[in-house]
Amino acid sequence: MRFPWGFDEEDESCGKMKMELAQQIMVLRQNGVSQFLVACDCGVGLYAAEIVNGLRARTDHDLMLICYTPHEEQATKWAPYLRERYFTMLENSTHISAVCPVDIPDAQLQAYKKIIDLADVVLCVYDTDIPATSSAEDRALAYAEGQHKSLVLLHPTELTTKQISAAHDAR
């Protein structure tokens, strides 16, 4: 999903979204979640992984970060500063696995599906007011709904959360 601020992490709205994402991760942790699975995508996946690694390093050594990358060369075309953050995040993670051996058209979706299949609850930064597209993120949310997963949807600009039990539809 695209955000109004694009990839500008200096934008105030991005900072606020990242703070709320951190809050939701801590709420999940307080509710017993000890393993966080990410697809390591540029954006929310990387932000979430960095938040979890920060918590692991500072206060919660029992927390686990498990990275399911779409394929091994995922970050090849990323900007150098993002590649550096990506590889640091992978270095500090508990476990790493590439879902696909090489880049294929739906590799990102396959990584999301792997995570959804293993998860008890799925935390998404998502705007349900925007019509769904064929993006990997939209298809992953539809997949999570179809798998009857519990969802925590964080609205990227309103910074509200919507918790959806496994039996309900997010839309």
Give the residues covered by each predicted segment.
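Acidic/glycine-enriched connector segments
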Residues: M1-R171
